[in-house]
Every structure is written in structure tokens, then in C-alpha cells.
């Protein structure tokens, strides 16, 4: 493909990270591959496209990641974010219902948050509508991430007694 890529991870020294960001901002590097580095403290406003492959149910983390990409920059009027979510198979399997429902409860609030701010909100929601409806969980399209996160923490503490 001829893309110039560079890793942007915690093992890269701070001074080298700054140089990498400069190269990215001026176009010498077209792709940054980052792990956890977009959660806090890194500004990359020139980014126009991002692919989030590591999911988190922590709203603070995913809002910060998204915010790093959506910052204003000269010549940039929008950004495209692809947030990959994990969902059950399309074919409903009653024996796995509890596992699949748990997965949806974790992923859907983040999806709903991202979709609500997206230009393709209704198209994105329609792609998952039938799947979520099979589990009778359409309410997840409107659940707020912080509410879900607090519920997950409470459930985790309940089971760890």
C-alpha cells in the first residue's frame, strides 16, 4: 500500500514520540499504531481517520480517545472514527443467551454514545437493530455509558463478595 507507519506505544521514549507526532502532523508518517496512548495526554488534532480496535466499557477512556481524534485542526472540518464493537453472532442461539446478552450490555452504550454524535447515526443503528431486538434489549440503544459503567461496577462488586 505504500503507507508510512509508526508505532506509538508506551515503550517509545517521550522525545521520540514528539518527533513522531511532528512527522505525522506534516504528513511524513501517514499511520500511527497506538495502544492506550490516546487515553490521556496526547493531542493529535490533524488525525482525520481513526480505527479503535480495543474496546473499553469505561466512558472516560472512550470519550478521551474519541476526543483526541475530533479536535479541530487547520484544514480539517470532520474526522471519521471506526469503533469496532463485539456483538453476538447474527443467528440467535438460546443456549448462549446469557453470555450474548452480557456482551451486548457492555458494548451497546459505547455504540449508542458514538452513534448519537455521528453523521450516520441512523444507518449505524439500523445495522444492529434486528440483532439487539432478538435479545429484547432495544433499551440499550438509549442507555447512557456512565449508567452502564456504574451498573457493571456494582454487579462486579456483588459477585466478588
Model regions and ranges:
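Long, largely alpha-helical accessory region at the distal end of helicase-like NTP-driven motors
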Residues: 93-161
